[in-house]
């Protein structure tokens, strides 16, 4: 091999080694060359012994000639020999060679090695390799499935052995059966009595103290309120069998008594409370001081007997009892008196009939007062149904008569009440007719009628024609399309850096549009933004034209109008913007600077600046379709759509377009 070929191999080796090391970092690779000095990255499968070329991703034939890079000696691959890092009996790291075909271990010198005390890196004895793998093991043992890898160390080495003839339940028990968890010894079971009452650790006040000490002002208010108002502690302590010994309810609520906690709710252990109760009760009666104190208490007993000597006092009480009975007998006597009372009551009612007549006179004296007359109208409506015969004049003032008729019909028989009522009714009727002064009602109606004509807008109608001639609308209004053609051409000259450009138009609106489009020819609009200006502008695909006379890329105007690129308010969301009939051109929801709905005026849906201003068209707009947000476009991946067009197909808002372009927020995500 010449030096030229050697240099060529070294150069190829540098490239291939870097590539293979990046693609296969965990594989031991041997580099060799074939008879034509072609470089190969060689790898031997430890299970099969096959040789692969990594750069070609192919298996090489077993007799393929391969040579070392720096010499002409052939490369010999030992058949299925695996190097292993093991630890001997002294825990020293040793590298051993395992031959799968012969199922033996060799040391680095090629000598057969006894691995009875050796273990591998996973602490598995190397003897297990000899027991589970190799041709001898497969020949001695007969299993339902052949050993994987033709004697390669089994992947299940070290796992529990499962009897293949056992039932599935037994196999599962052999595989996954674990020793039962160690039970707690008896010395850990607390058999002592519950401690005495301590208010610091009282179950009733503990939660309140924890709430006061750990109160978090930033926590949700309803969570804190829930812990306070809906707490079940009071109920559980009184009625929960797991919290207290409910056989002794008073003891559970006595602050000086012992109580059972949930740990001692067992009925067998609950009996342990009884001797604790007896212990404090014994010294109390044993106290000797109690006996002499009881002797004077017996002497004071006769003193108590002297107090009940008030026996004569109840005797007069018995005498007063008949005295009380006497007025009780008098009480039934007024019952006939009550019967007599309604009879005289009818007489003052008859006297009451002349009384309302002076009241009517009082009403007549203030004739000018409007509210009193209104009350008479209300009485007129109530009294009309009662008197059937008197149709014409009973209406103004029969108020006293019907009021009297209603109680009399209920209390007294109809025979006596009818003649009394008939006699007074004609008298007030005759007096009422002159008092009512029916012409009074007519002038009131006359007053309402003149009130209506001043409300009529006749003088306002006279004012309107006066305003109309003053308006200068016809002087500057654009004439209709039919009259535009004969008008003389309006011309305007715009001076740009490229020279003078003259535009001839016949329509004022077209002139304004072309003037606005020519305003974008200056360099400030077409040049690439400087680094410090790159983030002051929205991306080119996010621009929305706002006014005819406002240049789209006027840098001073954009710098001075930061409100156009601020985060939108609640009113400027797509839900609210649909009422304006305007659809945003390209809304990028990852870029809040593009949500400038306030600048969307006087333009229809999907108006893009590139189509409206053909002279101002940067290169980025050629991929506008890809950069534009497809949230509002329902025809995104339709095969019939044109991916190069800048405007999606027209959809009428009456055909459900708005509901699909601006869906309800609940359809965006369930968490909204």
From Swiss-Prot:
Q: Which residue ranges does the record annotate as region Disordered?
A: 177-197
Q: Signal peptide location in the record?
A: none
Per UniProt, the keywords (alphabetical) are: Cell membrane, Cell projection, Cytadherence, Membrane, Repeat, Virulence
Region (9 X 3 AA repeats OF Y-D-Q) residue spans: 98-251
Record's Gene Ontology CC terms? Answer: attachment organelle membrane; cell projection; plasma membrane
GO biological process terms, semicolon-separated = adhesion of symbiont to microvasculature
Report the transmembrane regions from the record.
Answer: none
UniProt-annotated location(s)? Cell projection, Attachment organelle membrane
Sequence segments annotated as region (2 X 10 AA repeats of V-E-P-T-P-T-P-V-V-E): 310-339
According to the record, the residues making up region (8 X 3 AA repeats of P-V-V) are 160-456
Repeat positions for sequence: 98-100, 106-108, 160-162, 197-199, 206-208, 211-213, 221-223, 226-228, 235-237, 249-251, 288-290, 310-319, 312-315, 316-318, 322-324, 330-339, 332-335, 336-338, 354-358, 385-389, 396-400, 402-404, 413-415, 424-428, 454-456
Name the domain of life this protein comes from.
Answer: Bacteria
List the residue ranges of the region (6 X 5 AA repeats of P-X-P-X-P): 312-428
As for what it does, the entry says: Component of the cytoskeleton-like structure which stabilizes the shape of the wall-less mycoplasma. This cytoskeleton-like network of accessory proteins containing HMW proteins 1 to 5 allows the proper anchoring of cytadhesin proteins in the mycoplasmal membrane at the attachment organelle. Essential for successful surface parasitism.
Q: What is this protein called?
A: Cytadherence high molecular weight protein 3
- Record gene name: hmw3
């Amino acid at each position: 091999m010449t030096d030229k070929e050697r240099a060529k191999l070294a150069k190829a080796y540098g490239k291939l080694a870097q590539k293979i090391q990046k693609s296969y970092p965990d594989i031991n690779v041997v580099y060799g060359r074939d008879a034509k000095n072609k470089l190969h990255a060689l790898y031997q499968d430890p299970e099969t012994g096959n040789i692969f070329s990594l750069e070609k991703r192919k298996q090489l034939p077993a007799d393929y000639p391969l040579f070392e890079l720096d010499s002409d000696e052939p490369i010999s691959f030992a058949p299925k020999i695996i190097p292993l890092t093991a630890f001997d009996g002294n825990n020293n790291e040793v590298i051993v060679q395992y031959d799968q075909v012969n199922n033996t271990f060799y040391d680095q010198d090629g000598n057969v090695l006894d691995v009875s005390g050796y273990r591998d890196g996973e602490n598995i004895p190397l003897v297990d390799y000899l027991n589970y793998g190799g041709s001898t093991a497969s020949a001695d043992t007969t299993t339902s499935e052949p050993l994987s890898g033709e004697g390669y160390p089994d992947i299940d080495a070290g796992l529990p052995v499962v009897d293949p003839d056992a039932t599935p339940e037994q196999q599962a028990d052999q595989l996954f059966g674990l020793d039962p968890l160690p039970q707690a010894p008896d010395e850990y079971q607390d058999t002592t009595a519950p401690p005495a009452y301590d208010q610091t650790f009282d179950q009733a006040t503990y939660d309140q103290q924890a709430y006061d000490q750990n109160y978090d002002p930033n926590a949700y208010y309803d969570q804190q309120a829930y812990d306070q108002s809906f707490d079940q502690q009071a109920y559980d302590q009184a009625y929960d069998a797991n919290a207290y010994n409910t056989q002794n309810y008073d003891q559970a609520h006595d602050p000086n008594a012992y109580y059972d906690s949930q740990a001692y709710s067992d009925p067998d252990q609950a009996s342990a409370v009884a001797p604790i109760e007896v212990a404090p009760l014994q010294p109390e009666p044993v106290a000797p001081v109690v006996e002499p104190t009881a002797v004077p208490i017996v002497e004071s007993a006769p003193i108590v007997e002297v107090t009940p000597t008030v026996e004569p006092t109840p005797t007069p009480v018995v005498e007063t009892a008949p005295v009380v009975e006497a007025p009780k007998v008098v009480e039934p006597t007024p019952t006939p008196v009550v019967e007599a009372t309604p009879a005289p009551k009818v007489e003052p009612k008859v006297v009451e009939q002349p009384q309302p007549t002076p009241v009517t006179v009082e009403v007549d004296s203030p004739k000018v007062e409007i509210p009193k007359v209104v009350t008479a109208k209300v009485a007129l409506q109530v009294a009309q149904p009662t008197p059937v015969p008197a149709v014409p004049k009973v209406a103004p003032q029969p108020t006293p008569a019907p009021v009297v008729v209603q109680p009399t019909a209920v209390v007294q028989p109809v025979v006596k009440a009818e003649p009394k009522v008939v006699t007074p009714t004609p008298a007030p009727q005759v007096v009422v007719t002159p008092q009512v002064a029916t012409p009074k009602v007519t002038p009131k109606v006359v007053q309402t009628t003149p009130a209506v004509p001043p409300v009529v807008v006749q003088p306002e109608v006279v004012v309107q024609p006066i305003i109309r001639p003053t308006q200068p609308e016809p002087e500057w209004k654009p004439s209709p399309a039919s009259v535009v053609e004969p008008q003389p051409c309006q011309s305007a000259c715009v001076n740009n850096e490229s020279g003078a450009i003259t535009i001839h138009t016949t329509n004022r609106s077209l002139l304004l549009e072309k003037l606005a489009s020519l305003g974008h020819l200056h360099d400030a609009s077409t040049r690439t933004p400087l680094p410090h200006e790159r983030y002051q502008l929205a991306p080119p695909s996010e621009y929305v034209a706002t006014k005819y006379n406002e240049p789209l890329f006027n840098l001073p105007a954009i710098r001075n109008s930061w409100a156009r690129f601020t985060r939108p308010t609640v009113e400027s969301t797509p839900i609210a913007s649909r009422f304006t009939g305007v659809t945003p051109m390209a809304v990028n929801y990852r870029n809040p600077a593009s949500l400038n709905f306030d600048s969307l005026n006087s333009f229809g849906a999907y108006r893009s600046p590139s189509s409206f201003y053909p002279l101002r068209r940067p290169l980025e707009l050629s991929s506008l379709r890809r950069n534009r947000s497809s949230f509002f476009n329902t025809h995104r991946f339709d095969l019939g759509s044109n991916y190069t067009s800048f405007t999606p197909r027209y959809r009428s808002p009456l055909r459900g377009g708005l509901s699909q372009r601006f869906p309800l927020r609940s359809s965006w995500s369930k968490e909204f």
